[in-house]
UniProtKB/Swiss-Prot annotation:
Transmembrane helix listed as a keyword: yes
Catalysis: reaction(s): L-seryl-[protein] + ATP = O-phospho-L-seryl-[protein] + ADP + H(+); L-threonyl-[protein] + ATP = O-phospho-L-threonyl-[protein] + ADP + H(+)
Gene label: WAKL9
Protein name: Wall-associated receptor kinase-like 9
UniProt main location, coarse: membrane
Residues with the Phosphotyrosine modification: 520, 620
Annotated GO MF terms: ATP binding; calcium ion binding; polysaccharide binding; protein serine kinase activity; protein serine/threonine kinase activity
Purpose: Serine/threonine-protein kinase that may function as a signaling receptor of extracellular matrix component.
Species this protein is from: Arabidopsis thaliana
A GO cellular component entry from the record: membrane
Glycosylation sites: 61, 123, 143, 250, 275, 303
C-alpha cells in the first residue's frame, strides 16, 4: 500500500512539473515583443513572467500624443533602444557589449525666463545597470565649464569658449592632452600640443561654443551627475552626458537643446543574480571552459558552443554572448543561431569567386580553377580599356576641334585687335573683361529660353549670373558684319571706359562665339517707357519729384557722353525704352548699339539715317548729319514724355498732333500746358518747376539744331529748376520766342509725310520705316545691331 502511494505521488509531481514548464513556455511565447516600435529582448520584458527579474521589467505607457513609450521601471526612464552582445560589435569574450539607451534630463543655466537652473543626476545604485564608457560629457554655450560628479578618482571636465581659438580642457586620471594625473596630483601640460587647428570647423565640437570630454577608466560608475560652474558670462548654457556627441558641432544652439530637455545616455547592463541556475540552464560555456576546449581541440577554427557566459561569482553578475559564427539572443535556450556566411549580405562575400560551404558556426571555401576565369576577365578588361580609350580619344578630338573653333572665332571677331587696345589703355581705364564662351554658357544656362529678357530684330538679351554672383545682361547678336569688326572693337574699348552712375556699364564681351556677345550690368526695374505708359508701377511715377530727378539723371549722363568722356560719344537713339531704372529708381542710359564716337575736332557725323520715329531729329533726318544737338532733340521728346505721360507716337491723337513733339509745341503755342500735364502729377506738382522744365523741353525741340542748348546747358538748367523757388504763373511757361517757325514749316511737313508712311524704326531712307505701334510698346530689352553702321 505504501509503495502504491509513493508511486502515485511521484506521478503527480511529474505531471505538475510538466504543467509548470508548459505554462512557462506558453507565457514566454505570449509576451509582447516590442513597445512603440522598440524591440524588447529577453531578459527584458513586459508583463508578469516575461522578464527575468524585476530589474528588467519594462512598462509600456501611452504618451500624451497617443504613442506607446517603453519605460525601464526600476529607474523610471524612457527607453529608446536595447542591444544584445553581438560578435560584429568587436567585443571581447570576457566583456560582451550590451546596452540600454535611455532619455536623461540635461543640466542648464540661464536658459529660461524665470531663471530656473536645472541639474542632471543619474543614480543606478543597487541595479544591474551602470553608465557606459561610450558616453561623453558635452557642454554647449559661451564660456561654459561643465564637469561630471561622482566619478572619482577621475576628473572629467571641459570648457567651451566663443573665441577664435579653442580652449578645451579634458582632465582625466589617464592621459588627456599630454596631462598625467596620479592620485589627484596634476603635472604641467601644454593644452595646445595635441590640438589640430585644421579640424576647427562647423561640423565638429572642439571648444568653440561646444566642447566634450570622454569618460575614462575601467571602474563601473553607477552614480553620475552633470554640473555647470558659475561664470560671469551671461547666456544660455547646457551640459549633459550622451552617446550621440557626433551629432553636435560648434554651431549647436544651447537654447534648442534646452527646449528639447533630454539627451540619450547609454547604460551597460548585466545579469544581476547570486543564483547562477539561470546561467547554467542556458547550456553556455564559461569563458575559461571555452578557451580550454577551443585551444586544445585539433579543429581550432570550429566553435564548440554557440554561446559563452562570463559568470563572476565574486561580483555577483554574469554576461553572455553568442560566439563567432552565431547570432541571436544568448539569454534564451538555443537563442544563438548559426550564421550562414555563404549568403551574400550587403555585397560581402567570404570566399570571393570560390565555392562557399556553410558549417555549424563556421564555413569553408572550396577553391576553383581560376585560369578560365582569369582569361575571361583579361579579355573583358582589355576590351573595356580599348572601348574607353576610343571614347577618350573621341572626346579629346572633339574638345580640340571646339577649342580650335573658339580660337578661330576669337581671331575673326577681332580678339587680337582688342588685346592690343587693352594693352595700350593699361593704367588709363578699367580693364575690359574678355569672357570665355564657357563662362557665359554657364551664366545663362547655355542661353536657355527661360533666361530671355527680351528679343529684337538684331538679337536677344539674356539674364545671367556670373560665378562671382553678379547678375548681368548678356546681349547676343543674330548677325555679324565682318567688315566692321575693327570699328566694333574700338567701340567696345571706348564704351568700357565710360564710368558714370547714370550710364549702364559695359562689363565686357565674348569673342569665342560665332557672333560677339556683349555683357552689361543688369538693371532690375525695367525701363522708363514701361513705368510711364504700361502702368508697370503707377505709384513710382505718381510724383513730379521722381520724374524731375530722372530727367536730371538722363541729362547728366548725355552731358558726360558729349563733353566729359575721353572721346565725345553721340548716343543716336535716346528714347524712354533705352532709359533703365535701377533698384533705387535712378535713371541709367543704355543700348549703345548705334552710338558713334567722334574726335574732338569734329562737330558731326555723316551716317545712314538711323533712329526711332518720334524721337528722331528732323534736321538729321533731312541732312544725314548727326550732331550732339540731335541727342538734345531726342532728350527733349523724353522730357515731354515725363511731363505729359504721353507716348512719342500715338494714333489716338489727331493727324497733325500724332508726334508728341508737334503736340507739345502746339500746346505751348496756345498756352495750354496745364491741359497736357499728366493727370497723375498735375495736382501734386510744383507748377513753377513743371513750367520751367517745359521751357527747357521747348528749347530742346527747336527745329534748328544750332538754336538748341547743349546737353551741358540742359543739365545745368534742370539742376537749377530742382532748387527751391517760388510758384510761377502758368502763362510764363510759354516761350515767346518762336523764331524760325515759318522757315522750318517745310521741314515739319516733310516729317509728317514720312510719319504717315513709317511703321517704327529707321535704318535706311524713310521708305524703309517699320511698324510704329511696335516701337511705342517695345521693352527695354529691344536689341539694336551689335555692330555700328559704317560712317561716311
Amino acid at each position: 500500500m505504501s509503495s502504491y502511494n509513493s508511486f502515485s505521488l511521484w506521478i503527480l509531481f511529474s505531471l505538475q512539473l510538466c504543467f509548470i514548464l508548459d505554462s512557462a513556455d506558453r507565457t514566454v511565447s505570449l509576451c509582447q515583443p516590442d513597445c512603440g516600435g522598440i524591440k524588447i529582448p529577453y531578459p527584458f520584458g513586459m508583463g508578469k513572467g516575461c522578464y527575468l527579474e524585476k530589474w528588467y521589467e519594462i512598462t509600456c505607457n501611452t504618451s500624451t500624443s497617443g504613442k506607446l513609450v517603453p519605460y525601464l521601471s526600476v529607474i523610471n526612464k524612457e527607453v529608446v533602444g536595447i542591444s544584445l552582445p553581438t560578435e560584429g560589435r568587436g567585443s571581447r569574450y570576457n566583456n560582451p557589449y550590451q546596452s540600454v539607451n535611455i532619455k536623461n534630463p540635461i543640466a542648464s543655466k540661464e536658459c529660461s525666463s524665470n531663471g530656473e537652473e536645472l541639474g542632471s543626476l543619474l543614480n543606478l545604485t543597487g541595479t544591474p545597470f551602470y553608465v557606459s564608457q561610450h558616453n561623453e560629457l558635452v557642454a554647449v554655450g559661451c564660456n561654459n565649464t561643465a564637469s561630471l560628479t561622482n566619478v572619482k578618482p577621475s576628473i572629467v571636465q571641459c570648457t567651451s569658449s566663443c573665441s577664435t581659438k579653442p580652449h578645451t580642457h579634458i582632465k582625466d586620471y589617464l592621459a588627456v592632452l599630454n596631462c598625467q594625473n596620479y592620485n589627484g596630483y596634476e603635472k604641467n601640460c601644454n593644452e595646445d600640443s595635441s590640438m589640430d587647428e585644421s579640424i576647427m570647423d562647423e561640423t565638429s565640437c572642439n571648444g568653440i561654443g561646444c566642447c566634450n570630454a570622454y569618460m575614462r577608466g575601467g571602474s563601473i560608475q553607477q552614480i553620475v551627475g552633470v554640473t555647470i560652474e558659475n561664470t560671469i558670462t551671461r547666456g544660455c548654457k547646457v551640459a549633459f552626458l550622451t552617446n550621440k556627441a557626433e551629432y553636435l558641432s560648434n554651431k549647436s544652439d544651447p537654447q534648442k537643446l534646452h527646449a528639447r530637455g533630454y539627451s540619450t545616455v547609454e547604460l551597460g547592463w548585466f545579469i544581476h543574480t547570486t543564483n547562477h541556475s539561470f546561467i547554467k540552464s542556458l547550456g553556455c560555456y564559461s569563458v575559461k571552459e571555452y578557451n580550454n576546449e577551443r585551444y586544445t581541440s585539433t579543429q581550432r577554427r570550429i566553435n564548440i558552443t554557440s554561446c559563452i557566459c562570463d559568470d563572476n561569482a565574486y561580483l555577483s553578475y554574469a554576461r553572455c554572448s553568442c560566439t563567432r559564427g552565431f547570432q541571436g539572443n544568448p539569454y534564451r535556450l538555443g537563442g544563438c543561431k548559426d550564421i550562414n556566411e555563404c549568403k551574400e549580405e550587403e555585397g560581402m562575400t567570404y570566399c570571393g569567386t570560390n565555392k562557399c560551404v556553410n558549417l555549424q558556426g563556421h564555413f569553408k571555401c572550396v577553391y576553383n580553377n581560376h585560369r578560365p576565369l582569369a582569361i575571361g576577365l583579361g579579355a573583358s578588361f582589355g576590351s573595356l580599356i580599348f572601348v574607353v580609350g576610343i571614347y577618350l580619344l573621341y572626346k579629346f578630338i572633339k574638345k580640340q576641334r571646339k577649342l580650335n573653333q573658339k580660337k578661330k572665332f576669337f581671331k575673326r571677331n577681332g580678339g587680337l585687335l582688342l588685346q592690343q587696345q587693352l594693352i595700350s589703355t593699361v593704367g588709363m581705364v578699367e580693364k575690359t573683361i574678355v569672357f570665355s564662351s564657357r563662362e557665359l554658357e554657364k551664366a545663362t544656362e547655355n542661353f536657355s529660353s527661360n533666361r530671355i529678357l527680351g528679343q529684337g530684330g538684331q538679337g536677344t538679351v539674356y539674364k545671367g549670373m556670373l560665378v562671382d554672383g553678379r547678375i548681368v545682361a548678356v546681349k547676343k547678336s543674330k548677325v555679324v558684319d565682318e567688315d566692321k569688326l575693327e570699328e566694333f572693337i574700338n567701340e567696345v574699348v571706348i564704351l568700357s571706359q565710360i564710368n558714370h552712375r547714370n550710364i549702364v556699364k559695359l562689363l565686357g564681351c565674348c569673342l569665342e562665339t560665332k557672333v560677339p556677345v556683349l555683357v552689361y550690368e543688369f538693371i532690375p526695374n525695367g525701363n522708363l517707357f514701361e513705368h510711364l505708359h504700361d502702368e508697370f508701377d503707377e505709384n513710382i511715377m505718381a510724383t513730379w519729384n521722381i520724374r524731375l530727378r530722372i530727367a536730371i539723371d538722363i541729362a547728366g549722363a548725355l552731358s558726360y557722353l558729349h563733353s566729359s568722356a575721353s572721346s565725345p560719344i553721340y548716343h543716336r537713339d535716346v528714347k524712354s525704352t533705352n532709359i533703365m531704372l535701377d533698384e533705387k529708381y535712378r535713371a541709367k542710359v543704355s543700348d549703345f548699339g548705334t552710338s558713334r564716337t567722334v574726335t574732338v575736332d569734329h562737330t558731326h557725323l555723316t551716317t545712314v539715317v538711323s533712329g526711332t520715329v518720334g524721337y528722331m531729329d528732323p534736321e538729321y533726318f533731312q541732312s544725314s548729319q548727326f550732331t550732339d544737338k540731335s541727342d538734345v532733340y531726342s532728350f527733349g521728346v523724353v522730357l515731354v514724355e515725363l511731363i505729359t505721360g504721353e507716348k512719342s507716337i500715338s494714333f489716338l491723337r489727331s493727324q497733325e498732333n500724332r508726334t508728341l513733339a508737334t503736340y507739345f509745341i502746339l500746346a505751348m503755342k496756345e498756352n495750354k500746358l496745364f491741359d497736357i500735364i499728366d493727370a497723375r502729377i498735375r495736382d501734386g506738382c510744383m507748377l513753377s518747376q513743371v513750367t520751367a522744365t517745359a521751357k527747357v523741353a521747348r528749347k530742346c525741340l527747336n527745329l534748328k539744331g544750332r538754336k538748341r542748348p547743349s546737353m551741358r546747358e540742359v543739365s545745368m538748367e534742370l539742376d537749377s529748376i530742382r532748387m527751391p523757388c517760388g510758384d510761377m504763373q502758368l502763362q510764363e511757361c510759354v516761350s515767346e520766342n518762336e523764331e524760325g517757325e515759318e522757315q522750318n514749316k517745310g521741314l515739319v511737313e516733310d516729317i509728317m509725310r514720312a510719319e504717315s508712311r513709317s511703321k517704327e524704326f529707321v535704318t535706311a531712307p524713310a521708305s524703309h520705316y517699320n511698324n510704329i505701334a511696335a516701337a511705342s510698346s517695345s521693352s527695354w530689352s529691344d536689341v539694336e545691331p551689335l555692330f555700328p553702321l559704317q560712317t561716311r
